[in-house]
């Protein structure tokens, strides 16, 4: 199976399945001498961890990460960092009744068509359970970026269904289970999740992720543009069906006189481009918006077929998120950090000696 790695200078490889014995990862390219311990990774893993609130899946995984290699006496050695997270709360029997069915909206059918077989237990490799290891690797990138140049990567729930959450207060994001910066939305979000659980249904979501204090100059023309790599990484997250950088599709209705980010001696006067021009960071905040589909694992009966070619109706039982967008926030942060770390190291390798006068204050 190809496609399990991302990055060039900072390279992350993951392995493992939803109901396998463990999830694993290998992180290459971390410079030596960086203080690193398991607790540095655990904070973000706990933010993504299932079973932590009544708004998400009730699968209870401690998600305690183990650093197997690449760290000695509390600092990175420059060699590959091996990571492992044990799976402890699998209930594979929940899926035995549907092992011959193709769940509508899931990867069951496409995996079977590609490989001729599939792991039906929770989706196997296609499950969002795999993203735990991305978050662990992303935590390494976030720490390095923060220490080296003060870069901060953070995200929030921007929309759930028809509920739009404004960016009113970043400090509120870590104070509620929705990662929502708008306290005025919390009651409506709670009511929506309650209604979805009662109906056995799910809902889509929008997530925004932002990188602040990023230096100008990151990104490689032409095919490795920073925004292209970010879109690639963010689209690889389970359930993501759309990615916008900056104003995204809203630019369709704008004129050039509105959309261009004018520059004065005091700096850029707007950020419609989302911090990236010509595929290279401008020094402004890098902003990405994600659209996540509603999970197809719901209690509402749906039509499908089985392996024998019979038309059937099925209900997907098990423990699932009524809105996957909630726990997608730390995952999106991790993927953005992984891409930024990769480009930071690439820039340092090629252009470390470049000194460009910046006329912008």
Swiss-Prot record:
HAMAP family: Chorismate_synth. CDD domains: Chorismate_synthase. Belongs to the chorismate synthase family. It comes from Sodalis glossinidius (strain morsitans). The gene is aroC. NCBIfam families: aroC (TIGR00033), PRK05382.1 (NF003793). Keywords: Amino-acid biosynthesis, Aromatic amino acid biosynthesis, FAD, Flavoprotein, FMN, Lyase, NADP. It is an enzyme of class 4 (lyase). This is Chorismate synthase. This reaction introduces a second double bond into the aromatic ring system. It catalyses: 5-O-(1-carboxyvinyl)-3-phosphoshikimate = chorismate + phosphate. One of its GO terms (cellular component) is cytosol. FMN binds at residues 125-127, 238-239, 278, 293-297, 319. PROSITE patterns: CHORISMATE_SYNTHASE_1 (PS00787), CHORISMATE_SYNTHASE_2 (PS00788), CHORISMATE_SYNTHASE_3 (PS00789). Homotetramer.
């Amino acid at each position: 199976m190809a496609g399990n790695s991302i990055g060039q200078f900072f390279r992350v490889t993951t392995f493992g399945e939803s109901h396998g014995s463990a999830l694993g990862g290998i992180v290459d390219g971390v410079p030596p001498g960086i203080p690193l311990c398991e607790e540095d990774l655990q904070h973000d893993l706990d933010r993504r961890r299932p079973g932590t609130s009544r708004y998400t899946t009730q699968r209870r995984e401690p998600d305690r990460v183990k650093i197997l290699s690449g760290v000695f006496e509390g600092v990175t050695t420059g060699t590959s960092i091996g990571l492992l997270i044990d799976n402890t709360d699998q209930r594979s029997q929940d899926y035995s009744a549907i092992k011959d069915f193709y769940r509508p909206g899931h990867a069951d059918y496409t995996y079977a068509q590609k490989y001729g077989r599939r792991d039906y237990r929770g989706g196997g490799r296609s499950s969002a359970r795999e993203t735990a290891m991305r978050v662990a690797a992303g935590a390494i990138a976030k720490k390095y970026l923060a220490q080296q140049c003060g870069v901060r990567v953070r995200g929030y729930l921007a929309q759930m269904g028809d509920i739009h959450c404004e960016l009113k207060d970043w400090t509120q994001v870590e104070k509620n289970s929705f990662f929502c910066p708008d306290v005025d939305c919390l009651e409506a979000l709670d009511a929506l999740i309650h209604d979805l659980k009662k109906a056995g249904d799910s809902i889509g979501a929008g997530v925004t992720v932002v990188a602040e204090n990023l230096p100008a100059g990151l990104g490689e023309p032409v095919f490795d543009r920073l925004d292209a790599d970010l879109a690639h990484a963010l689209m690889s997250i389970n359930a993501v069906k759309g990615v916008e950088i900056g104003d995204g599709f809203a630019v369709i209705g704008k004129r050039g006189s509105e959309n261009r980010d004018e520059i004065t001696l005091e700096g850029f006067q707007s950020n419609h481009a989302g911090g990236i021009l010509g595929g290279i960071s401008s020094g402004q905040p890098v902003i990405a918006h994600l659209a996540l589909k509603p999970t197809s694992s719901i209690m509402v009966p749906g039509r499908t077929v089985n392996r024998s070619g019979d038309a059937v109706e099925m209900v997907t039982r098990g423990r699932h998120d009524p809105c996957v967008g909630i726990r997608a926030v730390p995952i999106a942060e991790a993927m953005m950090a992984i891409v930024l770390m990769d480009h930071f190291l690439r820039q340092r390798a090629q252009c470390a000696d470049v000194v460009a006068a910046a006329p912008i204050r």
